[in-house]
Amino acid sequence: MESQASENGSQTSSGVTDDYSSWYIEEPLGAEEVQPEGVNPLCQPTVPPALHHACLASLSLLALLLLALLVRRRRLWPHCAHCRPGLPSPVDFLAGNRSWTVPTAVFVALFSNLCLLLPDENPLPFLNRTAASSPDGEPETSRGPWKLLALLYYPALYYPLAACATAGHRAAYLLGTVLSWVHVSVQVWQRAECPQDPKIYKHYSLLASLPLLLSLGFLSLWYPVQVVQSIRHRTGAGSQGLQTSYSEKYLRALLCPKKLDSCSHPASKRSLLSRAWAFSQHSIYTPEPGFCLPLKLVISATLTGTATYQVALLLLVSVVPTVQKVRAGITTDVSYLLAGFGIVLSEDRQEVVELVKHHLWAVEACYISALVLSCSLTFLLLIRSLRTHRANLKALHRGAALDLGPPLQSTHPSRQAIVCWMSFSAYQTAFSCLGLLVQQVIFFLGTTILAFLVFVPLLHGRNLLLLRSLESTWPFWLTLVLAVILQNIAANWVFLESHHGYPELTNRRMLCVATFLLFPINMLVGAIMAIWRVLLSSLYNTVHLGQMDLSLLPQRAASLDPGYHTYRNFLRIEASQSHPGVIAFCALLLHVPSPQPQPPLAPQDSLRPAAEEEGMQLLQTKDLMAKGAGPKGSRSRARWGLAYTLLHNPSLQAFRKAALTSAKANGTQP
């Protein structure tokens, strides 16, 4: 019996053990963890990113040293450092004859890499930093200092890639080909090996790297083309004639303007299509022959478009997939959750589920609509601002004074102006990012309020809060509307009278009586107008937050707006240091043979006062008589504009012979 009992006990214990072991069959074994549903496991590439970046950094440093041997510092120290290597310039911002494609592509690649730093745990990939964990399991070290170092690392990484284009040497183009191919190969390899990333969204890393891949792909094609062209032409100095092509085109377009076709056809005889085209030309930016935007403005516009894409992508993938998952996981338990807050949508639980899903779908639709509206407004204002930039630069080139707030004290470069010019593109990109973010928040709140107070209640026939509030307060609103309508009718028919075709104030006694009696009601109307003023100004400033060519403050306080202040000083440097007319005349002077010695003339380094006054009258942009003077008047104004520019341009005044200590006026030597 004892043996049988022990046998039964062993069987029972083993059976219980078997039963208990079956309970933990789904539990993780050892240190393994179960990935949540819908989350992809972290990709482990065959070649770690640390090795990729170590190779890229070494190759970039080697390329920079080779470029330093090619580029000599003859411009700074022509005698004492004739054979010493110098640091090549990555971008020549003030040269209007340079191609804008390579600097723009490099800046897009740099900005895209900085955007990819946002979800990255290792900002510096070649430093595999494992953060020490605290007893609570949280990392003790912060990634902030490493991300600050990454902000300096990536510009240094792409520095040689941009400098190879400015060197203008066949070996530099070949070096740029190798660098661009290595960069694009590393990026394509990483995206092909790990197309999905569990951070933020599985496809976010791939979608955010599209501008990076496009810019590097363009550079990998541009540099080989330059190598082939340099081998075919067998010369590297043949670009000197091309350097002044833009300046010559500018002078031709300025001195020989073509008659517009719209002037020969009256406005009444033009078709609807031509009117629409003329309106689009006046409202948005269209290329104009003979004028090119400065390189900084082109880079800023491209970075604004890239920033809009990156911010919109981040806003989209960080919210919409989460809302979709929440909507798909709603069950009947949500009715109990809402009942706990005192919200009873329906007695039927299944109907509550459908209503909640429909409301979440409405929230998602409002969010996407607000994002589309924000991106559309950003692009439209960007195109419009390019036209404003061109108009302001053309006016400054011809010596006109712009209504850009308080007048500048001097047109000469200053410390503040140089700092503003250096930071213009960076400010424009940051303003665009923040402006799109603020627009998204404001538009999302507005569309959500409109949807849940108007459209959703009307569709479902319940929760008509807005209509109920209007039903209870309709006497108040009717009184205000009638007061405004009656005042307008009385102002038009009672208090105004025409005498000999001129309106004149009449019935002054009745006017004073009506003003006194309607004072309380007008005070209520004023409160409504004050709320409308706040909303309108907030909406206006939100829409134009990304524009630096427009002050968000009144004209008297325009200098307090940091963005507008930066824009004014940027125009000041661009108009004085990279004037195409000045560049063209300097190029002509360099190519003109030295003249025969002439007898010394009377000192004269400027126009006669009467002649300069006559020229300034021609330069007045608001003179209607000068505008209607025809082609001869426009040609005269253009010539006087060039003369005024060559006399007063700050980049030339310091180098004219009258300003030198060892020379007399008009170039006469002692």
Swiss-Prot record:
<dbReference type="GO" id="GO:0048745">
    <property type="term" value="P:smooth muscle tissue development"/>
</dbReference>
<dbReference type="GO" id="GO:0007612">
    <property type="term" value="P:learning"/>
</dbReference>
<feature type="topological domain" description="Cytoplasmic">
    <location>
        <begin position="166"/>
        <end position="168"/>
    </location>
</feature>
<feature type="topological domain" description="Cytoplasmic">
    <location>
        <begin position="227"/>
        <end position="296"/>
    </location>
</feature>
<dbReference type="GO" id="GO:0003184">
    <property type="term" value="P:pulmonary valve morphogenesis"/>
</dbReference>
<dbReference type="GO" id="GO:0005886">
    <property type="term" value="C:plasma membrane"/>
</dbReference>
<dbReference type="GO" id="GO:0060322">
    <property type="term" value="P:head development"/>
</dbReference>
<dbReference type="GO" id="GO:0051649">
    <property type="term" value="P:establishment of localization in cell"/>
</dbReference>
<dbReference type="GO" id="GO:0048546">
    <property type="term" value="P:digestive tract morphogenesis"/>
</dbReference>
<dbReference type="GO" id="GO:0034633">
    <property type="term" value="P:retinol transport"/>
</dbReference>
<dbReference type="GO" id="GO:0032526">
    <property type="term" value="P:response to retinoic acid"/>
</dbReference>
<dbReference type="GO" id="GO:0016918">
    <property type="term" value="F:retinal binding"/>
</dbReference>
<dbReference type="GO" id="GO:0060539">
    <property type="term" value="P:diaphragm development"/>
</dbReference>
<feature type="topological domain" description="Extracellular">
    <location>
        <begin position="318"/>
        <end position="368"/>
    </location>
</feature>
<dbReference type="GO" id="GO:0043010">
    <property type="term" value="P:camera-type eye development"/>
</dbReference>
<feature type="transmembrane region" description="Helical">
    <location>
        <begin position="169"/>
        <end position="189"/>
    </location>
</feature>
<feature type="transmembrane region" description="Helical">
    <location>
        <begin position="145"/>
        <end position="165"/>
    </location>
</feature>
<dbReference type="GO" id="GO:0042297">
    <property type="term" value="P:vocal learning"/>
</dbReference>
<feature type="transmembrane region" description="Helical">
    <location>
        <begin position="51"/>
        <end position="71"/>
    </location>
</feature>
<feature type="transmembrane region" description="Helical">
    <location>
        <begin position="369"/>
        <end position="389"/>
    </location>
</feature>
<comment type="subunit">
    <text>Homodimer. Interacts with JAK2 and STAT5. Interacts (via extracellular domains) with RBP4. Interacts (via cytoplasmic domains) with RBP1.</text>
</comment>
<dbReference type="GO" id="GO:0003281">
    <property type="term" value="P:ventricular septum development"/>
</dbReference>
<feature type="topological domain" description="Cytoplasmic">
    <location>
        <begin position="72"/>
        <end position="98"/>
    </location>
</feature>
<keyword id="KW-0813">Transport</keyword>
<dbReference type="GO" id="GO:0061038">
    <property type="term" value="P:uterus morphogenesis"/>
</dbReference>
<feature type="region of interest" description="Interaction with RBP1">
    <location>
        <begin position="235"/>
        <end position="294"/>
    </location>
</feature>
<keyword id="KW-0812">Transmembrane</keyword>
<dbReference type="GO" id="GO:0038023">
    <property type="term" value="F:signaling receptor activity"/>
</dbReference>
<protein>
    <recommendedName>
        <fullName>Receptor for retinol uptake STRA6</fullName>
    </recommendedName>
</protein>
<feature type="topological domain" description="Extracellular">
    <location>
        <begin position="1"/>
        <end position="50"/>
    </location>
</feature>
<keyword id="KW-0597">Phosphoprotein</keyword>
<keyword id="KW-0845">Vitamin A</keyword>
<keyword id="KW-1003">Cell membrane</keyword>
<feature type="transmembrane region" description="Helical">
    <location>
        <begin position="297"/>
        <end position="317"/>
    </location>
</feature>
<dbReference type="GO" id="GO:0061143">
    <property type="term" value="P:alveolar primary septum development"/>
</dbReference>
<dbReference type="GO" id="GO:0034632">
    <property type="term" value="F:retinol transmembrane transporter activity"/>
</dbReference>
<dbReference type="GO" id="GO:0048844">
    <property type="term" value="P:artery morphogenesis"/>
</dbReference>
<dbReference type="GO" id="GO:0048566">
    <property type="term" value="P:embryonic digestive tract development"/>
</dbReference>
<keyword id="KW-0325">Glycoprotein</keyword>
<dbReference type="GO" id="GO:0048286">
    <property type="term" value="P:lung alveolus development"/>
</dbReference>
<comment type="function">
    <text>Functions as a retinol transporter. Accepts all-trans retinol from the extracellular retinol-binding protein RBP4, facilitates retinol transport across the cell membrane, and then transfers retinol to the cytoplasmic retinol-binding protein RBP1. Retinol uptake is enhanced by LRAT, an enzyme that converts retinol to all-trans retinyl esters, the storage forms of vitamin A.</text>
</comment>
<feature type="transmembrane region" description="Helical">
    <location>
        <begin position="99"/>
        <end position="119"/>
    </location>
</feature>
